[in-house]
Amino acid sequence: MNNRFLDACWGKPVDRTPVWLMRQAGRYLPEYMAVRSKCTFLELCKTPELAAEVTIQPIDILNVDAAILFSDILTPVEPMGLKLDFVPGPVFEHPVRTMADVEKLRIPNPEEDVPYVLDTIKILRRELAGRVPLIGFGGAPFTLACYMVEGKGSKDWANIKRMMYAAPDVYAALMDKVTMMDMEYLNAQIKAGAQAIQIFDTWGGVLSPTDYEKYVLPYTTKLINGLNRQNTPVIHFVKGAGTMLETVQKAGGDVMGLDWHVNLGKARDVLGQNMAVQGNLDPTVLYAPKEVIEAEVKRVLDENAGRPGHIFNLGHGILPTVPPENAIHMVECVHRLSQK
């Protein structure tokens, strides 16, 4: 088995830097689009055989060192009682705005309400047969709450911020419920066979460091502390968190995901030797000529300076129009340039 990814999560030495890409199963791959053309996005998420097929595609095509479950962070929110659609982005028909809305939300039972996610994990563990580890994932409580309150994507997330400041009791009740749901969901993924967990806090960086510490950190900390993670490393990725790495680190976890706005070496100095890091190439570099991609890969590796506990990744998801051959080249460069 290729254990490079798991070894790096635990800060152990590896023969070369492991690499995978956020959204590595996605629209930039013609093979993914061939499967996606037969069904809607939600149908793909809810059909275990198809979700497993697209999860494995980048392992075969890119030669990455880990697979990540194909799903969506909002998958477990729908059975809380919010109708979800994608048109093309996520839209909730009835956003959560009042205490009455929060009280209507239920805590789903993952085995009963999202069995397709757990079935996908079981199929993947069987089909991957130890080739690479399987990462499960979920949204962080704050990012999930952003979508639930806003009802859709937003540039300023004014509704969730208004709730935070003007109705803190409603915000706290919502975050408590979402955190409990998240804990049940991620523990069910671990039980089904996920070998690592990534928590995506895509919108945590829209808050000031003070507000993040007050309104987000307690819930993410509770979530991470509630995971059955004896042998399952947890990656915590907060996009836009470069100015508050020490605060984010207080949440716990084993690996800090970094976006491309921070120098990876300086981030490692701040975080200390006991926390592994993941990242952090700007996703748009994959539009560059191959020699530029190689130079940028080398720069990120040089910033890490050979320290153990580095997983190479993009600073956010791969973009849908990236040429697949550029992603293949990036992975090859990481492996070749980091070979011990």
From Swiss-Prot:
**UniProt keyword Membrane, yes or no:** no
Write down the EC number: 4.1.1.37
Task: Set out the biological process GO terms recorded for this chain's protein.
Answer: heme biosynthetic process; protoporphyrinogen IX biosynthetic process from glutamate
Q: Where in the cell is it found?
A: Cytoplasm
Q: What CDD domains does this protein's entry cite?
A: URO-D
Q: What keywords is this UniProt entry annotated with?
A: Cytoplasm, Decarboxylase, Lyase, Porphyrin biosynthesis
Q: Which InterPro entries match?
A: UROD/MetE-like_sf, Uroporphyrinogen_deCO2ase_HemE, Uroporphyrinogen_deCOase
Q: Which SUPFAM superfamilies match?
A: UROD/MetE-like
Q: What one GO molecular function would you report for this record?
A: uroporphyrinogen decarboxylase activity
User: Which pathway?
Assistant: Porphyrin-containing compound metabolism; protoporphyrin-IX biosynthesis; coproporphyrinogen-III from 5-aminolevulinate: step 4/4
Recorded GO CC terms: cytosol
Instruction: List the Pfam families hit by this protein, alphabetically.
Output: URO-D (PF01208)
UniProt-annotated site: Transition state stabilizer, residues: D72
Q: What is its main location?
A: cytoplasm
Provide the reaction this enzyme catalyses: uroporphyrinogen III + 4 H(+) = coproporphyrinogen III + 4 CO2
Q: Which PROSITE patterns does the annotation name?
A: UROD_1, UROD_2
UniProt-annotated binding residues for substrate: R23, Q24, A25, G26, R27, D72, Y147, T202, H316
Top-rank taxon of the source lineage equals Bacteria
- Entry's family note: Belongs to the uroporphyrinogen decarboxylase family.
Subunit details:
Homodimer.
Functional description taken from the UniProt entry: Catalyzes the decarboxylation of four acetate groups of uroporphyrinogen-III to yield coproporphyrinogen-III.
User: Cross-referenced NCBIfam families, in alphabetical order?
Assistant: hemE
- The name this protein carries in UniProt is Uroporphyrinogen decarboxylase
What organism is this sequence from?
Geobacter sulfurreducens (strain ATCC 51573 / DSM 12127 / PCA)
